[in-house]
């Protein structure tokens, strides 16, 4: 399973009503809210065995799956 597939699977567990693969502006446009964001961070932490620090919790890191994947990759292996 690729990192992108793992990411999409984790996101689907949080919000299965959103097609994350084609979405941009997830936070900026209100597609996901603060509760979703909290659940997404927990799902990513668990799926990738990483810890996302509070300083990284900003809209630019969660507006698209590409942004989230870049965030995950920054913390893999740390």
List PLM regions with ranges.
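Two-component histidine kinase catalytic core, primarily the HATPase_c
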Residues: 36
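Phosphopantetheine carrier-protein modules
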Residues: 12-31, 50-58
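C-terminal structural segments of small proteins and small subunits
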Residues: 54-78
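Residue-level recognition of oxygen-bearing side chains
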Residues: 6, 25, 67
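Thiotemplate assembly-line natural product biosynthesis machinery
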Residues: 1-19, 70-78
């Amino acid at each position: 399973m690729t990192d992108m597939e793992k990411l999409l699977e984790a996101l689907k567990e949080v919000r299965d009503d959103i097609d994350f693969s084609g979405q941009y502006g997830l936070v900026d446009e209100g597609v996901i809210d603060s509760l979703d964001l909290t659940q997404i961070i927990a799902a990513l932490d668990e799926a990738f065995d990483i810890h996302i620090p509070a300083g990284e919790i900003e809209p630019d890191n969660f507006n698209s799956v590409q942004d989230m994947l870049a965030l995950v990759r920054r913390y893999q292996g740390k």
